[in-house]
Swiss-Prot record:
The active site is at S171, D342, H371. It is found in: Secreted. Its main location: secreted. It comes from Mus musculus. Keywords: Disulfide bond, Glycoprotein, Hydrolase, Lipid degradation, Lipid metabolism, Secreted, Signal. Belongs to the AB hydrolase superfamily. Lipase family. This is Gastric triacylglycerol lipase. PANTHER family: LYSOSOMAL ACID LIPASE-RELATED (PTHR11005). The lineage of its organism: Eukaryota, Metazoa, Chordata, Craniata, Vertebrata. Catalyzes the hydrolysis of triacylglycerols to yield free fatty acids, diacylglycerol, monoacylglycerol, and glycerol. Shows a preferential hydrolysis at the sn-3 position of triacylglycerol. It is an enzyme of class 3 (hydrolase). It holds the Pfam family Abhydro_lipase. Its EC number is 3.1.1.3.
Length: 395
């Protein structure tokens, strides 16, 4: 969506080549897949396909060990990383190795697994439905919590022989964790600790332009966005990332457009990596996922998707209205980091969440941080990642 703003500006002022400054050095990872990005930096990579109970085929990636500890071939503690909304596993590996959480954990001795939610670039297959069908896209974060997380975590536990794993979630990755671990006690028992970055349980106070979407009637949202994909990665995104936003005079425009949706923290964004960030983002989701977030923004509650009528809700939930999720039912030990300039996971929403967490181990608010700083900030290792490594080692 913010990319469209950039495109409009380019159209108004004419062409990206030459006029807006010379092109910066290109990073080859911008055009790589997940496994290629991992091996490019000298780390081992494994790729798996996990089939969910309802037939979705998820791409799951593994970094079994780091460059510094390859000689230790015994069992390692497992760290599972789950991305946020319209994102993918690449979020954890798009910075340099000393600034990317997946690589940092691998070098710290962890068996690192990267998940992908249904519908994104690396999980766009189903046993029964084609991605061209409406049926394929009839999901939101409800199904990610109900089917994707259990299938992926069970696969990892079986593959590694570890009974419990560490779970790191960002943005919507925390949302599906809250839902899955509060409604599925058997799954919750497999989680050592939950590390929540920019946690989202409610969006009552969000100031993001996405809030405006909640004011649009649902029937009109369907007219505007359709009933299939929302913000899939395409050629335009790739072009903007590799040919436009990497130009000296346009990186500021691109970063400001991004900040409008996620909050401002100009000094912490590595603009030299813009082509990698935009070469893999947005990674897409369903329009139903978008509609679900609009529903939450309007209600201010964490609630299952409203299928539109009492009859449809009865078919899905055996009740006329969508059930609410009770975060306080989650007993998994949790550590929380949030940003003071995050307009998606607003500090007021986080303040509402914290008292509901019965096993809160740690909370830190980083005042300058926006929503994306937790995955891309240049000082993320000092502010967040080193603390995660320390806490994992203590458990």
């Amino acid at each position: 969506m913010w990319l469209l703003l950039v495109t409009s500006v380019l159209s108004a002022f004419g062409g990206a080549h030459g006029l807006f400054g010379k092109l910066g050095p290109k990073n080859p990872e911008a055009n790589m897949n997940v496994s290629q990005m991992i091996t490019y930096w000298g780390y081992p990579s494994e790729e798996y396909e996990v089939v969910t109970e309802d037939g979705y085929i998820l791409g799951v990636y593994r970094i079994p060990y780091g460059k510094k500890n390859s000689e230790n071939i015994g069992k390692r503690p497992v760290a599972y990383l789950q991305h946020g909304l319209i994102a993918s596993a690449t979020n954890w590996i798009t910075n340099l190795p000393n600034n990317s959480l997946a690589f940092i954990l691998a070098d710290a001795g962890y068996d690192v697994w990267l998940g992908n939610s249904r519908g994104n670039t690396w999980s766009r297959k189903n046993v029964y439905y084609s991605p061209d069908s409406v049926e394929f896209w009839a999901f939101s974060f409800d199904e990610m919590a109900k089917y994707d997380l259990p299938a992926t975590i069970d696969f990892i536990v079986q593959k590694t022989g570890q009974e419990k794993i560490h779970y790191v979630g960002h943005s919507q990755g925390t949302t599906i964790g809250f839902i899955a671990f509060s409604t599925n006690p058997a799954l919750a028992k497999k989680i050592k600790r939950f590390y929540a970055l920019a946690p989202v349980a409610t969006v009552k106070y969000t100031e993001s332009p996405f809030k405006k979407i909640s004011l649009i009637p649902k029937f009109l949202l369907k007219v505007i966005f359709g009933n299939k994909m929302f913000m899939p990665h395409n050629y335009l995104d790739q072009f903007l990332g590799t040919e436009v936003c990497s130009r000296e005079l346009l990186d500021l425009l691109c970063s400001n457009a991004l900040f409008i949706f996620c909050g401002f923290d100009k000094k912490n964004l590595n603009v030299s990596r813009f082509d990698v960030y935009l070469g893999h983002n947005p990674a897409g989701t369903s329009t139903q996922d978008l509609f679900h977030w609009a529903q939450l923004a309007k209600s201010g509650k964490l609630q299952a998707y409203n299928w539109g009528s009492p009859l449809q809700n009865m078919l899905h939930y055996n009740q006329k209205t969508p059930p609410y999720y009770d975060v306080s039912a989650m007993t998994v030990p949790i550590a929380v980091w949030n940003g003071g300039h995050d307009i998606l996971a607003d500090p007021q929403d986080v303040a509402m969440l914290l008292p509901k967490l019965p096993n809160l181990l740690y909370h830190k608010e980083i005042l300058p941080y926006n929503h994306l700083d937790f995955i891309w900030a240049m000082d993320a290792p000092q502010e967040v990642y080193n603390e995660i490594v320390t806490m994992m080692a203590e458990d």
